[in-house]
Amino acid sequence: MLAKKHGYRSRSAYKLIDIDCKFKLLQRGRYVLDLGSCPGGWAQVAAERVAEGGKAHVVAVDMAPMERIPNVDFVQCDVEHSPELLRAALQDRKFDVVLSDMAPKSCGHRQVDHANIINLCEMALDLAVEFLRSGGSFVTKILQGEYEQEFRRSLQYYFASVTYFKPKSSRSESSEIYLVGTKFKNPEHPYGNSEDAPSEC
């Protein structure tokens, strides 16, 4: 297996490599938060690419245990049901890049799988808005379907640029695709002018 030959824990590592070759997100010295990290392929790539002076600032998060990776801090928690545990672990830390390769267990029904992954994307976006530095970037995996455009519009509130990207290493027949948001904007006022904000009922 190619991933094992190159020392990566999963073939998904090549997806992040493809994404970074296109968008140049993982620059030296940047701080990275990796959501849904297990088994660790993305965290490995991130740590390699942002390392500076032998050190990297990468925090990996997953509900499942993960074997240690050099230069990666691991937080084991369920961000869907216990996000307060992650907040307690991170405290007031801020990141330049938030990555999410999270995916629910597939039930085999395309529409249900799509709705479930959109829920995870929304949760990842909430955490990105909370922990990103101004100007930062966000990458999340989605499955194409009914709610993808609505979610894309949510990203556009927070990022100056939102782009679809399908890595070369993704299977061509898969509905999996990534959304990449760059230039995180207005972290304190995500809707820009007050008239753009949704009204309260």
Swiss-Prot record:
Record's keyword annotation contains Transferase: yes
Keywords for the protein's UniProt record, in alphabetical order: Cytoplasm, Methyltransferase, rRNA processing, S-adenosyl-L-methionine, Transferase
GO molecular function: rRNA (uridine-2'-O-)-methyltransferase activity
Location in or out of the cell: Cytoplasm
Major subcellular location class: cytoplasm
Entry keyword annotation includes Cytoplasm: yes
Pfam assignment, any one: FtsJ
GO cellular component terms, A-Z: cytoplasm
Listed EC numbers: 2.1.1.166
Active-site positions on this chain: 141
Entries under SUPFAM superfamilies matching the protein: S-adenosyl-L-methionine-dependent methyltransferases
Domain of life: Bacteria
Catalytic activity: uridine(2552) in 23S rRNA + S-adenosyl-L-methionine = 2'-O-methyluridine(2552) in 23S rRNA + S-adenosyl-L-homocysteine + H(+)
Residues given in the record as S-adenosyl-L-methionine binding sites: 40, 42, 62, 78, 101
Similarity section: Belongs to the class I-like SAM-binding methyltransferase superfamily. RNA methyltransferase RlmE family.
HAMAP family: RNA_methyltr_E
Its biological purpose: Specifically methylates the uridine in position 2552 of 23S rRNA at the 2'-O position of the ribose in the fully assembled 50S ribosomal subunit.
Full protein name: Ribosomal RNA large subunit methyltransferase E
Organism: Anaplasma marginale (strain Florida)
Lineage of source species: Bacteria, Pseudomonadati, Pseudomonadota, Alphaproteobacteria, Rickettsiales
Gene field: rlmE
